[in-house]
Amino acid sequence: MGGILSSLNTSYTGLQAHQSMVDVTGNNISNASDEFYSRQRVIAKPQAAYMYGTKNVNMGVDVEAIERVHDEFVFARYTKANYENTYYDTEFSHLKEASAYFPDIDEASLFTDLQDYFNSWKELSKNAKDSAQKQALAQKTEALTHNIKDTRERLTTLQHKASEELKSVIKEVNSLGSQIAEINKRIKEVENNKSLKHANELRDKRDELEFHLRELLGGNVFKSSIKTHSLTDKDSADFDESYNLNIGHGFNIIDGSIFHPLVVKESENKGGLNQIYFQSDDFKLTNITDKLNQGKVGALLNVYNDGSNGTLKGKLQDYIDLLDSFARGLIESTNAIYAQSASHHIEGEPVEFNSDEAFKDTNYNIKNGSFDLIAYNTDGKEIARKTIAITPITTMNDIIQAINANTDDNQDNNTENDFDDYFTASFNNETKKFVIQPKNASQGLFVSMKDNGTNFMGALKLNPFFQGDDASNISLNKEYKKEPTAIRPWLAPINGNFDVANMMQQLQYDSVDFYNDKFDIKPMKISEFYQFLTGKINTDAEKSGRILDTKKSMLETIKKEQLSISQVSVDEEMVNLIKFQSGYAANAKVITAIDRMIDTLLGIK
């Protein structure tokens, strides 16, 4: 019903609406420094009109909703740009540290240690009897092996640091995820789509948690019923009815108000590095380590994972494997040469196979071919030679039988002056050692081996110069640590013979087999393989750094776009404040005028 009191109510709604606008503006200004606070706007519309006589009369203004200015599509791009930047920032920081362990070859490095090692053999070849040169060789060898082991230990330490960092990151992920699920529950309780009642502060808080969660983990967020709100802002797109955060291409860790935590467990490998499991409703664990390749978690896994449980290897594990291959190639090639130096007996390191296993079925790089066994008398004269063949089905039993067989190796129709008459071979399945020893030690005979492409001596570490299997345990034979003068630079026990020393210095120019798996052998020179290793590490770090620079630029660009939409502009809010204050004052003047009109009416007598 129309009338002067209705007019009073009309202006009163104007006062209330502008009061709300001033309140919202003040709230915007108060939160201007909060990056994740979305500026809010009051959506006002005329109240429903009614018929007054023959006229259609409006009765003031109604505050329909208070909505935040938020573009879900831009925010999604901003979040993605952020977790991509975080991925490469995390990766680069670790790869940069790893590359520092492998400086340029012209600086103090493993490469210079390697050169010093070969130069020591060269100096020894000039004077094979010089005890000082043997001591110098032992010192250079120990320096080389120490730096190889130290470099590997640094890589494994970096690997374990990244693994421990992952554990703390997953704890944070679980905390953020549970908070988001709780907020989803509260939003469901507070909001009403029909009445346009929005929990703006809860949504801002959820956006902030989601931003940081995806920074750590990546993934995709699925929201339904996203709508644009051009009345609020032309760039605004918000409101959803459901919320799911999916990671690993199929695992929902957040499903509305339900959160599925991630579990960290150590792998069964000796390194005990952490892997990630998804826990479903029935508490069943699924290994999703391989499926996480985004955010900080993805970067850490890509850096340190050791490949256990069928997962992919990380870059640090690749570097460790390459360093192990480098050490293994150096060990086997050196020992293959050193085993040719004549001694009173031959003894190998323990192996990991039984005497009835074919060499081809083991992981020992023993090839088809042959090797010669040579017996020398005390004057260094060759007195017997026997050739042993290795085929695809050869076992250690076959080798022992062939060596001990009573054959006429010298082909002089005398079966009592051949190799088997001076030396005997054995292999114990308990100690797993291959041994060749003299039948009569008092004769003082010498024995040596000459390889014809089998790598038998290098693979089994017969009379080794180097002990160990890879970069973790490579070392100078403990006998030569105690007594460097026992190093044998000769091939045959003859004064002035330094053939082994010559072959050792020549080794740096020869092709060597480098491998972790004997079915994937990389034949290279020792220096070439080291340069390949360092080149890969430095190239990976440089590539990651270049991508990081690109991702940073993209993040800054998208961040500016995001902030231009949602961030509070204090200048703009001050303009709005003046406008809303003027509107409030105008409505107040109308009320004052109506109040006087009422006084006039009441004063009529």
Model-found features: residue ranges?
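Structural signature of extracellular appendage/secretion-system components
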Residues: M1-K605
